[in-house]
Regions:
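Gram-negative outer-membrane beta-barrel transporters
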Residues: 378, 504-509, 526-638
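Outer membrane beta-barrel strand-and-loop segments of large Gram-negative receptors
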Residues: 228, 317-331, 364, 370-372, ...
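Short, acidic, small-residue-rich periplasmic hinge/interaction motif at the N-terminus
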Residues: 24-67, 104
Length: 721
């Protein structure tokens, strides 16, 4: 933890550096006002295409911007992007990404086009992923990502890592609040045929405690390390080989006070997480028109947690999870002419999960074979169309076809119109069907899969352990989720240099799977299960503006408006069938149609304002970013977390989220960074995240408060750049 003197020193140095930065700003016309070259995107079509040629909402985050922001982990980067909301897991441990109002399990996270596995409670822990070796992050929103399978209903986030490029090496270190230390280094080597890139990262922290009156930390101390490499080799004039690998390991030390009856008991223990992947890829060009790619991807994720009683050392809690994923795939691209490009491919997935969270602990398997196609067609010079689809067949959910259609029309040099429409599908996963899990370390909450919930609740009720409960007969089998989505947008150059984009989206989901509280124990511990919301939708708009206001200074503004509702509830409200009880007068009233807020954990309004300064000649970089999230409801996580009682959001007990319920208030985070590079290859950086120290210990435990840091890096390349 920084001392007060250290904190004051960093604030003073940042403000002083900003003063030097502003003193060098020239209020003159800048060449950045001219049209910039489009970046290349791979994710949207599985092939390299420029952003300007893609008829669907896409965005790109470069490594230069990541470096200027001072981000260390993937969640730090994504939380500042328009339309992306980082949300905590139900137990307050970990972070997932919400895209277009859809839950984290509907956004596919890829590394170089391959999926990252290991979703606890449906959420992929984003902080597992270091950003030091990232070349760029590509984000594709909406159904145009259907080439990647049914899990990508909301979209795809693809992390493109560095490849071997010349002979160079670098080292980076950073120290900050909560005794957080980050060390990383990379080296690249290439000759005529061989290229090697190696990256390593070590990250450790003491965690943080937002509720010192309770025993234990909000986030316990942990340390992890990442090692990755990529080797490329030219097998012939037309054939290239690439082999990439990654290894991650984390250890965490727990100290919890848990409730057992009316007693508070001290426990402690350790947890570890480990994952690895291997990805060989062969690319062969038969001629100037035909290219084929064969790849094999293997990955495994393991996690284990052991807690013991501090009094006698006896075992209190054990949790283990192991997930494996294997996938061979072949795809080809045929270039007919400038107006027609065809991509076809297919593959096979073998996936297994074994965990103590299932009653029998038996390893369960799922096998899926699939094929996909995509035709890129340009009928006219200003009009392009992409038609594609994917067919999946699984031993669990049978078969499903997911089509997509996207189109773009260049109205003129300043306005480009885009639209995409598609269908998606997601079957209930292992967790939603078989889970039987209790986490005493986070207040004793339990999660039951649909196949075991009714039987387990009947047992608890017979033992007199339930305070309230749904009728077990109301907890039925889950049905597969089906989606239909549409995105309509435009890219517009409003003024020379002033560029904007807007995207209207609508996601219609039938049988949306959501968590619900099905019972509360006599110890005030919640029991969750899963249910299908028969008809739900998320819709709204996203917009961004970018403008180089003065030389070397770029301004960006982003905003999202979101409506997310259960259509059956909406119709009941409109028909006058839903009531609420006024908490002041105790009078029961009919709920108005405009008083139904919608689904939990969705903010109606969110946005960001960012300023970036870059003067390569003088070696200065700086940024000031404001991230806003509007109010949202939290009804699905009432209970005890870290010893604190969370009040239910639905305080008028009508079973929905309306304007008279409790909300988490909207908030804004302010982040600052400044960096100075010198000619010898060194770069120094100072920064403050969450300048005004906003925290919400109960409802938003993934916000650690004010974070101050200082870092230094060194880079060297053989050509002197």
């Amino acid at each position: 933890m920084f001392s007060r003197f250290s904190a004051f020193s960093i604030v003073f140095l940042i403000l002083s550096s900003f003063g030097q930065v502003l003193a060098q700003v020239e209020f003159v016309e800048d060449s950045l006002r001219t049209r910039e070259l489009d970046e290349v995107i791979i994710t949207a079509t599985r092939n390299e295409r420029t952003m300007g040629a893609l008829p669907m909402p896409v965005s790109l985050i470069s490594n230069v911007k990541i470096r200027t922001m001072g981000s260390l982990r993937l969640n730090d980067v994504l939380t500042e992007q328009t339309g992306l909301v980082v949300v905590p897991q139900v137990n307050g441990q970990g972070n997932g990404i919400q895209l277009q109002g859809l839950n984290p399990e509907y956004t596919l996270i890829l590394i170089d086009g391959e999926p990252v596995v290991g979703r606890n409670t449906g959420t992929l822990e984003l902080s597992r992923l270091a950003v030091g070796n990232i070349k760029q992050i590509e984000i594709v929103k909406g159904p145009s990502s259907s080439l990647y399978g049914s899990e990508a209903l909301a979209g795809v986030i693809n992390i493109i890592t560095e490849r071997p490029s010349g002979s160079k090496y670098g080292f980076r270190s950073r120290y900050g609040s909560n005794n957080t230390m980050d060390l990383s280094g990379d080296v690249s080597y290439t000759n005529k045929k061989l290229g090697v890139y190696v990256f390593g990262n070590s990250y450790s922290t003491d965690g943080y405690d937002l509720s010192p009156e309770n025993s234990g930390n909000t986030v316990s101390p942990f340390d992890n390390y990442t090692f990755s490499s990529k080797v490329t080799y030219q097998l012939g004039n037309r054939t290239d080989l690439s082999v990439a690998g990654r290894f991650f390991h984390e250890d965490q030390r727990f100290n919890f006070e848990v409730l057992q009856g009316n007693n508070r008991i001290q426990t402690s223990g350790i947890g570890n997480t480990q994952d690895w992947n291997l990805n060989p890829v062969v690319t062969h060009r038969f001629n100037s028109r035909l290219k084929a790619i064969g790849r094999f991807y293997a990955t495994k994720y393991k996690s284990k947690t052991d807690l013991s009683f501090e009094a006698d050392g006896g075992s209190y809690y054990n949790d283990e999870l192991s997930q494996s994923f294997l996938r061979p795939e072949v795809n080809g691209e045929y270039y007919f002419n400038d107006k027609n490009i065809l991509t076809v491919g297919g593959g096979y997935i073998s996936e297994s999960v074994q965990t103590t969270r299932y009653d029998d602990g038996v390893e369960r398997f799922q096998y899926t074979s699939y094929g996909f196609f995509q035709h890129e067609w340009m009928p006219f010079a200003k009009w392009s169309v992409i038609l594609g689809g994917r067919y999946d067949r699984s031993n669990i959910y049978g078969s499903q076809f997911s089509p997509k259609l996207s189109s773009q029309f260049d109205l003129n040099d300043k306005i480009v119109l885009k639209a995409s429409v598609g269908k998606g599908f997601k079957a209930p996963d292992f967790r939603q069907v078989y889970l039987n899990f209790t986490n005493p370390a986070a207040g004793g909450y339990s999660v039951l899969g649909s196949a075991v919930a009714a039987e387990r609740l009947a047992e608890l009720d017979a033992n007199g352990e339930l305070l309230t409960s749904l009728d077990p007969s109301q907890i039925g089998d889950l049905e597969a989720e089906e989606s239909f989505a549409i995105n309509i947008g435009a890219n517009i150059e409003l003024l020379p240099g002033l560029k904007g984009d807007i995207n209207l989206f609508h996601n219609q989901i039938d049988n949306l799977i959501e968590t619900q509280i099905v019972a509360t124990t006599v110890f005030n511990q919640n029991i969750f299960s899963y249910r299908n919301i028969l008809r739900a939708y998320t819709q709204g708009l996203e917009t961004n503006l970018n403008y180089p206001i003065i030389k070397n200074v770029k301004l960006s503004v982003g905003y999202q408006l979101l409506f997310a509702k259960d259509k059956d509830v909406k119709e009941s409200v409109e028909n006058g069938e839903v009531f609420y009880r006024d908490q002041n007068t105790l009078i029961t009233r009919r709920l108005g149609s405009n008083e139904y807020f919608g689904l939990y954990n969705r903010s109606r309004h969110s946005g960001n304002i960012k300023l970036f300064y870059s003067n390569r000649q003088q070696g200065w970089e700086a940024s000031a970013r404001v991230i806003y999230r509007g109010k949202f409801g939290i009804g699905d996580i009432s209970g005890n977390i870290q010893g604190e009682t969370i009040p239910p959001s639905d305080r008028n007990s009508n079973g929905i989220l309306d304007d008279y319920d409790d909300f988490v208030a909207g908030y804004a985070l302010v982040n600052l960074s400044v960096a100075k590079s010198i000619t010898s290859g060194f770069r120094f950086q100072l920064g403050i995240d969450n300048v005004f120290d906003y925290t919400e210990p109960v409802f938003i435990p993934n916000l650690p408060g004010r974070i101050m840091y200082a870092g230094v890096s060194y880079s060297f390349s053989k050509n002197g750049n």
